[in-house]
Amino acid sequence: MSFIDTRKLKVIERKPGWHGRYFDSPSMTFAHYEFEKGATIHEHSHPEEEVWQVIEGSLEITIGAVTKTVGRGLVGIVPPNTRHRVVALSDGKAIVTDTPRRIFEGKP
């Protein structure tokens, strides 16, 4: 068992307006994001399942052909290999979890 102080993790801006702190467990990748209004993540897919949980603010998340406004209390679940897109409707914070662990450029 281990504990991680996410406040001490390096902040990485992988895409404009998305400031993330990243860490892994043996089977998952976690991203704690602070996002800026208007920031987008282009439509894409990947082999990992992805879960979006908004902590503050709101996001417009498109999963496949369904678009929803996601705020505190609503979780977006992206199945593996499914096209999805995210637009920040306000400034805010979100936790994103990928399983299995996700490998991408720029992640510590």
Language model features with spans:
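Ligand-binding loop in jelly-roll beta-barrel domains
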Residues: 80-104
